UniProtKB/Swiss-Prot annotation:
Aquaporins contain two tandem repeats each containing three membrane-spanning domains and a pore-forming loop with the signature motif Asn-Pro-Ala (NPA). This is Aquaporin TIP1-1. It comes from Arabidopsis thaliana (Mouse-ear cress). In all the vegetative organs, but not in seeds. Preferentially expressed in roots. It is found in: Vacuole membrane. A motif (NPA 1) lies at residues 85-87.
Amino acid sequence: MPIRNIAIGRPDEATRPDALKAALAEFISTLIFVVAGSGSGMAFNKLTENGATTPSGLVAAAVAHAFGLFVAVSVGANISGGHVNPAVTFGAFIGGNITLLRGILYWIAQLLGSVVACLILKFATGGLAVPAFGLSAGVGVLNAFVFEIVMTFGLVYTVYATAIDPKNGSLGTIAPIAIGFIVGANILAGGAFSGASMNPAVAFGPAVVSWTWTNHWVYWAGPLVGGGIAGLIYEVFFINTTHEQLPTTDY
């Protein structure tokens, strides 16, 4: 079962007004999400004297990221699709749902949105450190890599099922909620181990501002592999599967 056409895109696509508007929407949505997510961790650290790594800090991070992503996806959905994540964009590309050129434009916007968000946070908080993603004690690089693959697979699979699949019908209206919920749940599951990034842009901004690059590749490779697998599986086995409704009988 072939997937939809994977396309590079026309050379002028990167300068088309609709593509530029979509990229701007991705920039704004990612900025909103990172301010809420990273900002909540900084606020919790300030209020609890660096207690963001405690169980209550984990719950606070999960709630803030779930709510923040719900809003970020909602405000961008009708303009760019509300990806807010290079792994989601990559999964959409693997499934033939976005061209390579537009995907690169989205990536640039998402990364810039994250960096600008972290710079704003650092300035607005009077120079507080923006915490970068890192592995917890006793967690190996391979462990974190697998965790990021699995969690991002769940995220991108949810995006496909609720937002990309043309058969989703009314399910599409709850897509932002479902996407926010899966991210919040994954943070509760994996936050104590890898930090549960699931999003290269979310990891990139804090890494740039704090200039912390230890094991940073994990937060790119894991999500991209997981997102790509999810996009491929959903596109091949579900979107392109023809469905014939069972006959009904009146009694």
